[in-house]
Amino acid sequence: MSASITDTTASSLPARLARLRGTAVAAPLGARGIEQSARTARCVRRQAITLAGLPPARVAERVGARERDQQSPFAIASGNLFEHAMGMSGAHQLLALYRAAGRLQPEECRVVDIHALPPSLRRAETLRLIGQKLDKRTTAPHLILQPHLAVRIAGRDEAIRPDLLVASDADACYSVGDIKSFADLDGRTSAASIRGAVRQVAVGVLALRAAVTSLGATDPERLVSARAEVVLRRRGAGRPSLRVIEQVDEVDIIARHIARAPALLAAVEAALPLGATLDDPDVVMALPYRYDADCREACPLAEACRRQAAAAGDPIIVGATGRRTLAAAESSTRALALLDDADAHGTADEDELAARLRAAERMLGEALHG
C-alpha cells in the first residue's frame, strides 16, 4: 500500500514534511518563526505553514494578505547600522555596557565573532568555544558574537542565530543576548517589541541548552539561565542600553511547543484532503484556523484569516470581549437574529443573551436620544 498524506506511521518526519510542502521549497524558521508559531499554537493553519518550513510572509502574499506594519527602508538601514556598530572595534561598546552593568570586569575582554569565520566552520567553532567555557578554561571568550546554534523541531535541525552569548569568568556558562535597534524609552518602549525580543531569546536559550547537552552536560537547565539580555539603543543616541528580563515561563512555553511538533504534524495531516499540499493557496485557506486579535502581532496571514472570520460571523472581529460576550450565540449573525426577532426562541443561554442585547440596545437608544 502506498503512503498517503495521512499515513503517519510509514514515513519519517522529514519525508512527511516534504509531502506536506509539495513543490514549495523549505526555508529556515529561525528564532522569530519558532516563537511566533508558539504564540499561535491553537491554529492548525499556522502550524501547517511553520512545520512545513514555508515562509509565512510569502504564503500570506499568495493568499492575498498584505503584510502589516512593514518597516521603512530607512528604519531597516538604521537598525542594521546599530547592530553592526555593536560588533565593531572589538565590540568595545558591548563590553563597556556589560562592565557598567556589573556583568563583566574590566579585564574580561575576550571577544570572538563567529561570522568572521568561513560558513563551514561556524557551527563547530561555536560548540568548541562553549566547550571551553564548560571546561572552565581561561581561554573561553567573554562575548561570542553571532553564534551558530540549533534546535531540533519535527525531525530537523533549525538554525538559531542569537546576536550574542555573554559570560564572565565566574559564570558557569553563557547567557543569550539579542540586539534590537528600537529605542529604550525609559519604560515606555513598545511592550510588543520587548515581548518579541524576549521570546526570540527564549528560543536561543533552548538552542544553547541543546548545545551544552550535546557536549555532555547533564543539567542544562541549571547551567543555562532563562534570562534574556536585550540590548537596546539609548534614546537620542547611538549608544546601547541593557535590559535583563527573567523569562522562565516563555522558555517553558516554547519548549513544550517544540516537543508537541510531531502531534501538531499529525493534526495538520488529518485536516488535509488526500494528496493536498501546501503549495496550493486554496488548500492553505481551507485548513482550520483560529483568528484572535493578537494574531496581527504574530502572523502575516492575520488579514486573510480576519476576512474569513468576518464572513463566518465570528464575534472575534469585534475583539476578545465580544467573542466571550456572544459565545452563547456562536456567531454575530445569530446574535443579530436574536436581537432583531423578539419572538425568537433558542437555548436558555441564547434567551439570556438576547435579553442582555435588547437591554443594551435600549440603554444606547436612551443615551443617544434622551
Language model features by range: what are they?
Residues 1-167:
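Metal-dependent nuclease catalytic cores that hydrolyze phosphodiester bonds in DNA/RNA
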Residues 43, 295-299, 305:
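Short cysteine clusters
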Residues 141, 147-258:
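Mg2+/Mn2+-dependent nuclease catalytic core
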Residues 246-298:
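Polybasic (Lys/Arg-rich)
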Residues 288, 292, 302-310:
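Acidic, Mg2+-coordinating catalytic module of metal-dependent nucleases/exonucleases
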Residues 308-318:
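Short cysteine/histidine-rich zinc-coordinating motifs and their immediately flanking basic loops
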Residues 316-370:
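C-terminal non-catalytic accessory extensions
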